[in-house]
Amino acid sequence: MQSIRLASCALVLLLAAACASTTLVSAWQNPAYTGGPIKKVMIIGLGATPGGRAEFENDMADALADAGVIGVSSSGYFADARELTREAVRAWVIRDGYQGVLVTRLESVQQTQTVQAPQYTDLWGYWGYYGVAVTPGYVVDDTKLRITSDLFTAPSGQVVYTAELTSVDPPSRQKLIHQLVDLLVTDLTKRGLLPPKP
């Protein structure tokens, strides 16, 4: 019986891990934009930690390079996120000839706790002796992240694309970032805002 319970717990944990996902919830493209694919982008990540910011920006730069786009991490210009003022970013964008600025922000982190009630099953062969077998209840902790990403043209600052993404129980920061980058680059390419992959 103990081995069955342990196996059941392991299965629950495995299924929970399998359900962890990052999804593109919604996206909007400015119909007034007619500038074609953007080929040089400054990448700005506004996350919970400086390490997360740099990791996202560098991963996005690598993914853009694979698509034939010059993507540059803002961390190289502004090590401290507090330096990311409108005026400072605009000056760098104009000076270095960027066509776009991609700003991705961690908007919220929501943590919930769900109590799964015990499951009761008839214990065949022991009915009337032990009564019923009880599978103990357990607590499930969920973490949901909401992320937004906006692409602006430079130097005008026109919004050409905005997306909302969610991630439920990401297994690690690295995997979360990889999923975010893949979803964003795929959608931007599909919409013609980035050039098709060579």
Task: Please annotate each region the language model reported.
Residues 84-151, 155:
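Surface-exposed short loop/turn segments
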Residues 19-40, 48, 135-198:
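C-terminal/domain-edge helix-coil "capping" segments
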Residues 19-81, 88-98, 166, 193-198:
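A structural "domain/chain start" motif
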Residues 3-4, 94, 173:
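Structural motif marking the loop-to-transmembrane transition
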Residues 2, 53-63, 113-118, 122:
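Surface-exposed flexible segments
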Residues 1-10:
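Bacterial N-terminal signal peptides that target proteins for export
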